[in-house]
Amino acid sequence: MRTGLLLLLTAGVAAAAVPSDANLDTILAKIQQRYERQRDALCGYTGTRVYTLHNSHLSHDTVMKYRVTMSRSSGKHFKLISEQHAGFLARHALTTLVDAEPDSRKQEQQGRLDRANYKFALLGEDVLNGHRCYVLHLSPRRQSKYLVSGKAWVDVESYAVRRIKGQLAKSVSFWVGKPEVEEDFANSGGFWMPSYNSSLSHVKLVGEATVTIRFSNYRFQRCGQ
């Protein structure tokens, strides 16, 4: 997950013809510049995540709410706030996803959109939630649970990644396998952060399961403050 990256399913989106002024090298360079500006400005944050597991064999959806704290010095930490209808297997499946959350520094290096991690192709333009985006095809250069084989939607104006959709390039765990994932990002207080994540997994002993994650209540520690 991506949360960093992990986690779903929406219908595929057809890309329009590639605009004449689009250049893949320029797009990737501007993505990197925007990433570096955010990395240099953001020293930590706290937030809330609500994980929901749906499975046809369960009488109720399992919901687990976490408080997330991230800092450059200590990485990312989760604290369980509440849970509902969390039977043993469902709880184990969700805690496995949380435990698989990558170390922030490792995710920065191994999961970001750059030529060290991916081969790219510019598919064209699309409108996503009212915003013009470039659509990039993502082909991971190696098997990694931090990489996605699929597509990325990049905002034409800000060069921020608004959506990543596809399948993880490597199994997250024995229990979860390789989920089909979709993660949306939004501007929060000047920083582009995950806002919604959904994944379809085939969980051992539970069967096909859909997991959604809703991100909220971000509070940021800006560097130098």
Residue ranges and their predicted role:
Residues 6-9, 28:
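Generic leucine side-chain signal with a strong bias for well-ordered alpha-helical environments
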Residues 17-149, 156-161, 169-179, 186-193, ...:
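Structured extracytoplasmic
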Residues 1-4:
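Positively charged n-region of N-terminal signal peptides that target proteins for export
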Residues 164, 195-197:
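Beta-strand-dense domains in secreted/periplasmic systems and polymorphic toxin scaffolds
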